């Protein structure tokens, strides 16, 4: 009786598979042929009760999976609830080949370094970037949050030489992610870390100083290879006044002043210090460095100026620093990552399931 029941289930599954396959093949070929000119394309829209950047996510088009991909499955894929695709914008339900996904985002983030560092240094920097990207994606996927800050460049838009070189690096690390206490981390990064003019030390900003949240693996660490962004960028505060002239014109109000003595390792000012006309500022608009990483002084004419360093939030891995460590010290990607993310471990997440899709389900049924 048991064998008859098993036989009946298998027969029913095979019959269902045949029906679905017959219906899927014409649809798959139609997908390849494209939509006839002038005919509107209808895309599925799911109800998602959230917004991204103020935009209603229910209005975002979803990336649709090819029928044959669903039937046969794919060995190495990653599905993101939201992802920016170059040339398309923000999309929902994005399912990509894992290697292509990591290559496309790595190229967007760090694609140009192959032209100014050695091939071996570029490989290690790309590996570090790919592992950080994979970890970031898995973290945001796990918690259902958006990875819309990243931009995926479709691999067919990447120059062949760059694609080949980056893909070599990605394939070597595609199964690796960063973990802390066994859980995948939010592996944030920025273009460049800051510079502490008091100590002469370049360094990153901690999660606590940047966002008010103490994250054990996002601590402030030294990042010595930031020269590319060490050119002073300034915003003039009170263009038409010297300090004395400005303060004399504001009788009874607080002077223009700034205390930059309380800094973390990277030179990021740790709390409200800048005062202008009685107001304190935590974040000042129009700065390319979104954290405090500045000195306050005057130019040759006595005009108040603010000088700041770095590019980006300065938390986690510095791309400039990672390239420098690889090029100047010969560091491998593991050393680079473990330097920037305090106390982390590397973990293999496997290469995906070669038994995916509907037929993967069938194979499990017959085991």
Residue ranges and their predicted role:
Residues 2-367:
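Conserved, single-site charged/polar hotspot
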């Amino acid at each position: 009786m048991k064998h008859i029941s098993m036989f009946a289930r298998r027969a029913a599954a095979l019959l269902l598979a045949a029906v679905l396959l017959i219906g899927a093949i014409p649809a798959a070929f139609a997908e390849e042929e494209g939509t006839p000119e002038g005919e509107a394309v209808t895309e599925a829209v799911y109800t998602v009760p959230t917004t991204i950047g103020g935009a209603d996510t229910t209005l975002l088009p979803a990336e649709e999976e090819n029928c044959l991909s669903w039937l046969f499955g794919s060995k190495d894929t990653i599905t993101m609830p939201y992802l920016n695709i170059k040339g398309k914008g923000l999309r929902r339900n994005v399912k990509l080949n894992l290697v292509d996904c990591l290559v496309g985002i790595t190229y967007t983030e760090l694609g140009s370094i192959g032209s100014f560092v050695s091939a071996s240094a570029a490989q290690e920097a790309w590996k570090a970037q790919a592992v950080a990207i994979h970890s970031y994606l898995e973290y945001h996927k796990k918690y259902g949050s958006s990875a819309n800050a990243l931009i995926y460049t479709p691999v067919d838009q990447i120059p062949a030489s760059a694609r080949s070189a980056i893909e070599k690096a990605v394939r070597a690390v595609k199964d690796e992610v960063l973990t802390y206490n066994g859980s995948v981390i939010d592996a944030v990064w920025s273009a460049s870390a800051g510079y502490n003019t008091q100590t002469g030390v370049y360094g990153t900003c901690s999660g606590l100083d940047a966002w008010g949240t103490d994250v054990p693996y996002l601590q402030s660490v030294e990042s010595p290879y930031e020269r590319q962004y060490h050119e002073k960028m300034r915003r003039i505060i009170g263009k038409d006044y010297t300090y004395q002239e400005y303060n004399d014109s504001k009788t009874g109000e607080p002077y223009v002043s700034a205390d930059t003595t309380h800094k973390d390792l990277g030179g990021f000012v740790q709390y409200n210090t800048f005062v202008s006309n009685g107001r304190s500022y935590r974040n000042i608009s129009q700065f390319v460095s979104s954290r405090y990483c500045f000195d306050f002084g005057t130019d040759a004419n006595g005009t108040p100026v603010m000088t700041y360093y770095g590019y980006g939030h300065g938390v986690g891995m510095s791309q400039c620093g990672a390239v420098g460590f690889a090029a100047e010290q010969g560091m491998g990607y593991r050393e680079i990552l473990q330097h920037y993310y305090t106390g982390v471990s590397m973990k293999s997440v496997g290469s995906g399931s070669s038994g995916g899709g509907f037929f993967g389900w069938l194979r499990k049924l017959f085991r």
